[in-house]
Regions:
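A short helix-loop-beta-strand connector motif used in the catalytic cores of GNAT acetyltransferases and
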Residues: 1-13
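Conserved beta-strand in the GNAT
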Residues: 10, 16-26, 44
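Secondary-structure transition/capping motifs at alpha-helix termini
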Residues: 14-16, 30, 68-70
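Glycine-rich, positively charged N-terminal anion/phosphate-binding segment
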Residues: 23-37
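Feature marks short, surface-exposed loop/turn motifs that line or immediately flank catalytic pockets
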Residues: 27, 81-85, 133
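Acyl-donor binding region in acyl/amide transferases
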Residues: 34-122
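Acyltransferase donor/substrate-recognition loop-hinge adjacent to the catalytic core
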Residues: 103-173
Length: 173
């Protein structure tokens, strides 16, 4: 987060925490073309939790104000600090366990955020595939093509070189 600016907010009622939110923007993302999703003037809020709709709206308004005061003219949210962390709201599948790098929130957040003026920017999907069933044929075909391509190397992570391999994975993502 060397190139990001952020402010954290905590809502209290009677001295007791009842919600939280982050307001943030990535200076590198501001330089991207808007067609790539961010672009000039785009800020975000995330790390969102609220006890009720009134708290939710107060926190969202505070995050929007902070972003506006720093020149942001558009808000893409919720995104927890980076698009590479937890983007979006879970709107279906609350009966399933959380997925890696995907938000998992209370069902009512969808309507609270919509009533705060937000609409869907992009639908994100996760899939639950029991490993004992193996991969679908399409995935197997893609892997086979990759194995035949001399420019692609498929190998397990080398635990003795974990930092190096983690950097490679992050670079790919």
């Amino acid at each position: 987060h060397d190139h990001a600016k952020m402010q954290l907010f905590l809502a209290r009622r009677g001295g007791r925490p009842v919600g939280r939110i982050s307001a943030h923007y990535d200076e590198l993302a501001l330089e991207q073309p808007p067609e790539q999703g961010m672009g000039p003037g785009t800020g975000n809020w995330g790390l969102f939790e609220a006890e009720d709709e009134a708290v939710a709206h107060a926190l969202i308004a505070k995050a929007e104000e902070w972003l506006r005061n720093r020149g942001m003219t558009r808000v893409l949210a919720p995104i927890s600090l980076s698009i590479w962390e937890e983007p979006g709201l879970l709107v279906k599948g609350h009966d399933h366990p959380p997925m890696v790098m995907m938000g998992h929130n209370r069902p009512e957040y969808e309507s609270w955020v919509e009533r705060a003026g937000y609409t869907v920017a992009k639908r994100l999907l996760t899939y639950d595939l029991p490993v004992e069933q193996g991969f679908p044929p399409l995935v197997n075909r893609i892997v086979a093509l990759g194995e035949k391509n001399e420019r692609i190397r498929i190998r397990p992570v080398d635990k003795s070189q974990f930092k190096r391999d983690a950097a490679i994975i992050i670079d790919i993502l």
